[in-house]
Amino acid sequence: MFYPDLFSTCKQFGNNFINTKIPITMNAVTIDFNSVIKITDEQFYQLCQDNPNVKFERNAKGEIIVMPPTGGETGNRNFEISVDFGIWNRQTKLGVCFDSSTCFKLPNGADRSPDVSWIKQERWDTLTPEQKEKFPPIAPDFVLELMSPTDTLKETQSKLQEYIDNGVRLSWLINRKTRRVEIYRQGQEVEVLQSPIELSGEDVLPGFVLNLQTIWD
């Protein structure tokens, strides 16, 4: 019932639709406003700022995706993974780490928020202060997606491939339910691992090793 109302609001108020408050949904919902209004980058950014309790993404077609909140088990494991990355990055000082609240503007026009991401310091430093403050217009060097019960495998795989197609050098898709990991690399076939104990950051994340035991437990 909410989404038709939002659509009507968009028709009536045009650019002012960004002031509409969005409720939290338990399943990802894709909304296409393209037939009514072309949402600019600034409008999308403002929509996110006006609804801080809701996580949004936007695909390359300009459709807005309302993401569900993360459950306790997935959230806990996301935190543990982020801690491991944070410790490694503080020790090496090679780049900048981000959590799932950070949205990146990819070269294909999509706005994506990986669960964990990392950018090499030299690339991060090429951005202006304003670009860093808003949704950085850059593809991370590394991204990780930890599937939650509300995610679909096909859509998540498509997202991981999108990252690679837009310049991400290494990405991991971790599926707790099947204990399977998919590794995406530039110019290579996807590597699938069943119940691995650890993952290496290879030459993208020098010296980093992610222990997966806490993820599988």
Residue ranges and their predicted role:
Residues F2-D217:
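Gly/Pro/Ser/Thr-rich low-complexity, intrinsically disordered segments predominantly at protein N-termini
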